[in-house]
Curated annotation (Swiss-Prot):
Family: Belongs to the major facilitator superfamily.
Gene: MCH1
GO cellular component term of the entry, any: fungal-type vacuole membrane
Record's subcellular location: Vacuole membrane
Role: Probable transporter.
Protein name per its UniProtKB record: Probable transporter MCH1
Disulfide bonds listed in the record: none
Organism: Eremothecium gossypii (strain ATCC 10895 / CBS 109.51 / FGSC 9923 / NRRL Y-1056) (Yeast)
Length: 450
């Protein structure tokens, strides 16, 4: 497949420099993969957004509803745009997404730092900024994910599981980094002006490194195109445009795709709500932040899910069993939150956070692997990107439900944690329905496919 004019221009100088650098191709190949994996970590730093809740409320005077609107703006930007990002990557290569992430991250975080330092709310401008940050988060992660999948298309561990695992590591590393006293600047909460300025600098450096990594993918594409022209087409080469259009048409007309979308809406929606509101929930129960438990379980689940799926494939076991297992963990985790609010039991919340984190991380590994297995790599970016629209809707619905119930029932001093239990009965029910639809999807459509 020939390069687009834009991809050619964006990578031209880097490719020329790399060609003249004398580095062995294997060295460039491995270096690009390692850079892509490392880029997945800062791509996941937005998972720390629940730690911004207290500074926003205390320093800028945002209400819980306004904080949840900012959370929803991130989710909206992150989940609505993946189909477009997938199409842009297919047309112009992952380098296009890495540049989009740079343009989206650096100015917005610089502005958000200024807003916090000024002490003025600037709420609507902040909503726009965090919508762009949500878009940029997915652009950087997709750029890294597609780079890894192009470099190692035959390995699910390298192409999907490891990028997802490194993305999940952001929660663990980020929460530890933000414990450094410098980020508090003597305040009882995070000084977000320092946090956001640091992120602006970090994303500048990461974008520069990804420019080189994605240019190596372009070199691989040029190499494959040269083999095609010579009549030695590789079986891993991209399909012809008409074949891609046919597969896209088949995907959008496949009823199973809509079952899959519903499963993700009813599972990732509640998980996003729990993740973004665990700060206020922990305060309600008098418990320290349970984000580390969620983050560690999520990271471990991302890696283990990939390994278990490889074992399932090797032993002829349906990979759907892994999705059922992680959904069941989510059901149990959210039900334990209900028990924790009834008993005002903080340690129970830690267990619920770990189980919910395992569900969350597992879904982000299992879902792309199932998408790749059923609809193929030719339309993987567009297909998986399309699925990411549905959790946006779910996260907004469940997040705003949490905010309204919290503001209505849980703001007076001395209120009991049971005031919020109805939200988690809803999330438990939603995950149980998602599990039911996942089983039906397998029995009706995928019995012989996965």
């Amino acid at each position: 497949m020939s390069l687009s004019s834009l991809e050619h221009k964006l990578t031209y100088h880097v490719r020329n420099w790399l060609h003249g650098s004398g580095f062995a191709w294997n060295t460039l190949h491995m270096s690009a993969f390692l850079v892509a994996l490392c880029a997945c970590i800062p791509a996941g730093f937005i998972s720390q957004i629940s730690l911004y809740s207290e500074p926003w409320r205390e320093h800028l005077g945002y209400s819980v509803v306004e904080v949840n609107v900012l959370f929803s703006a991130v989710n909206l930007g992150g989940y609505i745009t993946p189909p477009l990002l997938g199409l842009l990557s297919d047309a112009h290569g992952p380098v296009m997404l890495s540049w989009l992430s740079f343009v989206g991250f650096v100015p917005t975080y610089a502005y958000a730092a200024w807003v916090f330092a000024s002490g003025e709310p600037h709420f609507y401008a902040s909503v726009l900024c965090f919508t762009l940050i949500g878009i940029s988060t997915n652009a950087l992660y997709f750029s890294a994910l597609f780079t890894a999948s192009k470099l190692y298309p035959a390995s699910k561990l390298c192409s999907i599981s490891l990028p997802a695992t490194f993305y999940g590591m952001a929660s663990v590393l980020g929460s530890q980094l933000l414990k450094i006293p410098w980020f508090r600047n003597g305040l009882p909460y995070l000084d977000l002006s320092r946090v956001f300025r640091t992120l602006a600098v970090a994303y500048t450096l990461i974008s520069f490194c990804m420019w080189f990594a994605t240019s190596i993918v372009t070199m691989l594409k040029v190499k494959a195109a040269t083999l095609t022209f010579a009549g030695m087409q590789s079986p891993t080469e991209p399909l012809l445009p008409q074949d891609i259009r046919r597969r896209l048409r088949n995907f959008f007309h496949d009823p199973a795709a809509y079952f899959m979308a519903l499963v993700l809406l009813l599972s990732l929606g509640p998980m996003e709500m729990f993740l973004t509101n665990m700060g206020s929930l922990s305060s309600l129960l008098g418990q320290a932040s349970v984000l580390p438990e969620f983050a560690i379980a999520s990271t471990c689940s991302r890696f283990l899910s990939g390994l278990i799926i490889d074992l399932c494939i090797h032993n002829g076991v349906s990979t759907m069993s892994v999705q059922w297992a992680v959904l069941l963990l989510g059901v149990v985790g959210q039900w334990i939150v209900v028990l924790a609010t009834r008993a005002s039991d903080g340690p129970l919340l830690s267990l619920a956070s770990a189980l919910s984190g395992a569900c969350y991380g597992g879904l982000f590994t299992v879902s792309p692997i199932l998408t790749l297995a059923v609809w193929g790599d030719a339309v993987f970016g567009t297909a998986y990107g399309s699925f990411m629209i549905t959790p946006a809707v779910g996260s907004i619905l469940f997040g705003l439900t949490y905010a309204h119930i919290f503001d209505a029932n849980c703001t007076p001093s001395g209120v009991l944690p049971v005031c919020i239990q109805h939200v988690f009965w809803s999330s438990t029910s939603a995950l149980a329905i998602a599990l039911l639809f996942s089983v039906l999807m397998y029995l009706v459509f995928w019995r012989r496919k996965v």
